[in-house]
Curated annotation (Swiss-Prot):
This is RNA pyrophosphohydrolase. Accelerates the degradation of transcripts by removing pyrophosphate from the 5'-end of triphosphorylated RNA, leading to a more labile monophosphorylated state that can stimulate subsequent ribonuclease cleavage. Residues 6-149 form the Nudix hydrolase domain. Its cofactor is a divalent metal cation. Belongs to the Nudix hydrolase family. RppH subfamily. InterPro entries: Nudix_hydrolase, NUDIX_hydrolase-like_dom_sf, NUDIX_hydrolase_CS, NUDIX_hydrolase_dom, RppH. It comes from Neisseria meningitidis serogroup B (strain ATCC BAA-335 / MC58).
Amino acid sequence: MLDREGYRPNVGIILINNRNEVFWGKRVREHSWQFPQGGIKPGESPETAMYRELYEEVGLLPQHVKIIGRTRDWLRYDVPNNWVRREWRGSYRGQKQIWYLLRLTGRDCDVNLRATRHPEFDGWRWHQYWAPVDEVIDFKRDVYLGALKELSSRFLRGMESYEDFAARQSSDNR
C-alpha cells in the first residue's frame, strides 16, 4: 500500500535498555545492522503495527516493553532505483515512518529472534545510543538520525546530543 506520493507507510522501533543503549539487529545472512521496522497493513494503526513488528522481528510482547514516545510526524526516505523491485518502479519512492521509542522492561533473555518462521535478524546487540548512525545504509541515515534526535530531545532528558557524541568520537580517533 503506497500513499499518493509513492511512500509505503511503515513503523520504526528504537528499543532501549535501562542504560539507554539501543537494540541493534543483524539482518539474516547479511552484514548489515538496523533497528526493527516494518510496513503498516491496511486498517492497522501505527501502534498496532509497531507491536506486531516488535514480535515478528524481536520476539517481544507488549508486556516486555514500555512506550516512551513516538515521532510527531512521518519521517521519509527515498530508496535508490537499483534497490526498488522492478514491478514497483515508477510508483514507489520509498518509506514514510512513524518511529517509536520503547524501553525494555523485560529481560535480555525475552528477546527471541526466532519467534516467527521467517526471522528478519540472526543476531543482535546493545549499542551506545548514537553509535549506530554511522553504520546505517546511506539513504536511511538522515531518517535514523532524525528519529534518534527527536526522541532523545523530547523523552530522554540529559542524553548527550549527537553533535557532542560526534565531536567526542572525532577527538577519540585522533
